[in-house]
Curated annotation (Swiss-Prot):
Cofactor: Mg(2+)
Function per UniProt: General (non sugar-specific) component of the phosphoenolpyruvate-dependent sugar phosphotransferase system (sugar PTS). This major carbohydrate active-transport system catalyzes the phosphorylation of incoming sugar substrates concomitantly with their translocation across the cell membrane. Enzyme I transfers the phosphoryl group from phosphoenolpyruvate (PEP) to the phosphoryl carrier protein (HPr).
Source organism of this protein record: Haloferax volcanii (strain ATCC 29605 / DSM 3757 / JCM 8879 / NBRC 14742 / NCIMB 2012 / VKM B-1768 / DS2) (Halobacterium volcanii)
Active site residues per record: H191, C498
Stated name of the protein: Phosphoenolpyruvate-protein phosphotransferase
UniProt cross-references to Pfam families, sorted A to Z: PEP-utilisers_N, PEP-utilizers, PEP-utilizers_C
PROSITE patterns reported for this sequence: PEP_ENZYMES_2
Top-level EC class: transferase
Amino acid sequence: MTERTLSGIGVTPLSGVGTVVWYRPDADLPEPPAPVDVDAEAELARFEDARAAAEDELEAERERTAERVGEEEAAVFDAHVQFLNDPQITDGVSDAIESGLPAEHAVQETFTEFVEQFENMGGRMGERADDLRDVRDRLVRVLSDGERVDLSSLPEGSVVVAERLTPSDTAQLDPERVAGFVTVTGGRTSHAAIFARSLALPAIVGVGEELQSVEDGTEVVVDGESGDLVVDPSDERKEAAAAAADVDIRHEAVETADGVDIEVAANIGTLADLGPAVDRGADGVGLFRTEFLFLDRESPPDEDEQYEAYVEALESFDGGRVVVRTLDIGGDKPVPYLDLPDEENPFLGERGIRRSLGPDADLFETQVRALLRAAASADGANLSVMLPLVSTVEELRAGRERFESVAADLDAEGVANELPEFGIMVETPAAAFMADQFAPHVDFFSIGTNDLAQYVMAAERGNERVSELGDYRQPAVLRAIDATVSAAEGEDCWVGMCGEMAGDPDLTELLVGLGLDELSMSAVTVPQVKAAVAETDTADARDLAERVLQADTKAEVAEILTLDQ
């Protein structure tokens, strides 16, 4: 066969070689019949039962995904529960049933109308149509007593090819068996793309209808960086792809071309993330999210359970720095043992350090005790701790005083402990504006660009209609980063970054130029960012940063960065 290439959007900087396995889940969905004489009351009851069963499935799936992939990725299933219970949708299904449709057909018809509405909006809103499809297909399957297709045990070396992959589909994929996936539709910010990065899977989306010409069993090369799908590749192409898949991972510290050390660390959402982070060459952990210890359970973890988790992270990196973020939970997450307020906008409400110094003070003290003990667990244990959502000097001082008072308590009890390196997340405009006042009181700042962009631009992260505003390439966001780094200069205070921006190799030179000392990201991009650091000259990087900071618009920023590539 002659080698040919199809092009799409590469979403992971990884390559894979394997055999096509087509996944066509829509084939078994029933076509809606003309309205018939049905027992509307019985069908409505079936629909309600199916909703309850689907919600139970989603909660279980959320828990599995949080454990296997990460808490942030698992949050997509919270959105699915919202769709499942959305009054507009449920009322539409009820109306369709009362007009004479059986429940499964009413679900299919109503959800499909909403899917089309989302697709017509385009952009990121269009990508969210896959979430609606996922909920629709789940309900239809439950109503039809259908079996769920199992993607978790595919033959080794499979390349999954599909019209689209929903979050439920992608969460099943096993990186040990699957060599990658390719879809007809989709974009860089789709949930399938996000899961691919978290699972370290080569992936291409948005190839278009030409992908339908690739048959089951065909050998392919998936280049997740360029977006090229090579069909019937030559032996030379396969060997080159296999070599590319065997990434030259640096397992030692990296420095710029002119000798400046930059730490490249991994973000950790569960203990299962530690192994891949080590394997991909992370120097340490730049963000250890502790929420997974507290979620999906009926009571909080005790001191010893937390201690063991923190020690496991420290031992995984054997002297590499592990930065733990204290509990950051608010009204957006269901925690049965906490009295969380029902807030209109929980992201601007009682969360993070606000709860730790208030209603969750006892929980915070237990966490602090575990952290102080972990810091003294072994010679060379390199633990740092940071507080989330700090906005005032009073919060910072109170948080630090809590660590010092708990350390005194442990000393009095004769329990080995050590005060770790202490810092704060910079994710609110207040923290960026007040960074010069915070710097004398901390050992480090960690800039959370996802939330910083959201709060600086007043553009909710989950609201697709304003997603372009909440981009970290916005000049206001870049200037907030620059202000934070500038405030740390002259103080014994290093500056890291743990948002999505840190893991973009195309932005590494800019971030070095802005003065970042540490970059933390999903483990999958660690090798590429290390390679980008090694190619960066700090003088050139500072020049790039100065030019970017003069830009008035996001488009100007993008143009400067493109010209510099």
